[in-house]
Structure formats: C-alpha cells, structure tokens
C-alpha cells in the first residue's frame, strides 16, 4: 500500500491543492460580494435608454453544428501532427492505422456534406 501511495502522492496532492484553492476562491467571491443585484443592475444597457428589444435573442443551431465540426476536425489535426513527426519510425501497422483513421473521418465528412450539414441557407 505504501508503494501505491508514493506513486500517486503527487497527483493526490495536486488535486487537494486545486480543490482547496477553488473552494477558497468560491467562498471569497460569495462573502465579498458588495451587495445583491437589483433590477436596474441586471437589466440590459443600451446607450442610456431602455432596451428596444429583448437582449436574449435566439441562437441558430447551425452555429453549434459548425463548432462541433470544427472540434472534430481539429482533433483530427491533433492526432495527425504527432503521427507525421514519427512517421519514419513507425511500422507498417502505425501507417495503416492512421490511414484507416483518415478514411473514416473523410467518409464522415462526405456524409455530412451529402446530408446538407455544411449548407448555410
């Protein structure tokens, strides 16, 4: 048990310190809040006048789709970059595993394109 504790003591210490700091900051922000917000403070400010329209407009779902597609292909690049650096040292299995990964992502991209997920009308 002592050996196991020695291996994970740095990680446990890091989690304990980060949890303590997070709790301390949250408690300080709660107790040092100068005053509760009134209706005037939480209202939308528009050049000193009352707002003409509701400030909370709806958000188009296509923006979320574009963000998710960006994350997927950004993740692809994060896998592709280290692979390209060690390509000369990899075996044939490492090469073909990344080719299969790229084929799957390409097929997914073609599927999204055919379904019209990339169309902005």
Swiss-Prot record:
One of its GO terms (molecular function) is NADH dehydrogenase (ubiquinone) activity. Its main location: mitochondrion. The chain crosses the membrane at residues 11-31, 63-83, 90-110. It is found in: Mitochondrion membrane. InterPro entries: NAD(P)H_OxRDtase_bac/plastid, NADH_UbQ/plastoQ_OxRdtase_su3, NDAH_ubi_oxred_su3_sf. It is a multi-pass membrane protein. This is NADH-ubiquinone oxidoreductase chain 3. Keywords: Electron transport, Membrane, Mitochondrion, NAD, Respiratory chain, Translocase, Transmembrane, Transmembrane helix, Transport, Ubiquinone. It comes from Porphyra purpurea (Red seaweed). The gene is NAD3.
